[in-house]
Design a protein with these regions (language model features):
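Active-site catalytic motif of lipid deacylating hydrolases and related acyltransferases
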Residues: 2-64
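Active-site nucleophile loop of the alpha/beta-hydrolase fold
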Residues: 11, 40-43, 94-104, 134
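Acidic catalytic loop of the alpha/beta-hydrolase fold
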Residues: 15, 135-140
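Catalytic histidine neighborhood in serine/cysteine hydrolases
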Residues: 33-36, 150-166
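Gly/Ala-rich beta-loop-alpha elbow adjacent to hydrolase catalytic centers
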Residues: 68-79
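Conserved alpha/beta-hydrolase "acid-adjacent" motif
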Residues: 105, 138-144
Length: 191
């Protein structure tokens, strides 16, 4: 019987077989954990309303004690959700990996901004939320600390040379994120 439930949400264009999210979903399932790793609608041309509907369906199925892991544009999706959490169980922990900037030149990204979320919204949505990002992420040149960490009062773990923390940056298997999933909120994926 699974002891935890995990919801893994991909970003723009999804996460293919070589992505750390796909690897992580397999590792957690192999341990007998409950994992939902949905394909969000139209990942190449995402629309916030459609992605929110898909997230709402996932959250309606998930039990209390959910651990959520978001990559890239899914981080922004989660933050939109944090503004309106009525009727949904509070996530236990949330990890936002490589959130993009509104200036990122990705199709559909502009439709996810502006983002008007407050620290209290994030606190209501999850017991703990933290960010993992890199200073050299081409999709967040301003830096996740400046755009998200400071305004939302969230801890940002910096991955040196991590780029967008995807396969292009060497993030297929990522044991540190698996450790975060199975450990406490203090254990952090930094490499």
């Amino acid at each position: 019987m699974p002891s935890m439930s995990f919801l893994i949400l991909h970003g723009w264009q999804g996460s293919g077989p070589g992505h750390w999210q796909t690897w992580l979903a397999g590792r957690l399932r192999d341990r007998g954990e409950r994992v939902s790793y949905p394909e969000l609608p139209e990942p190449d041309t995402p629309r916030l309303a459609r992605w929110r509907e898909a997230l709402d369906l996932e959250l309606a199925r998930e039990p209390v004690g959910l651990v959520v892991l978001c990559h890239s544009l899914a981080c922004v999706l989660w933050l939109h959700h944090a503004r309106v959490t009525d009727g949904y169980a509070r996530a236990e922990r949330v990890l936002l990996v490589a959130p993009p900037s509104p200036s990122a030149e990705l199709p559909g990204v502009q439709g996810f901004f502006p983002l008007s979320v407050e620290p209290a919204d994030v606190t209501r949505a999850a017991g703990s939320t933290e960010i993992v990002a890199s200073h050299d992420d081409p999709y967040c040149p301003e830096g996740a600390e400046r755009l998200y960490g400071e305004p939302l009062e969230l801890h940002v773990r910096v991955v040196a040379g991590g780029g967008h923390i995807n396969p292009d940056a060497g993030y297929g298997p990522w044991p540190a994120v698996e450790g975060w999933c199975l450990g406490s909120a203090e254990d952090g994926p930094e490499d």
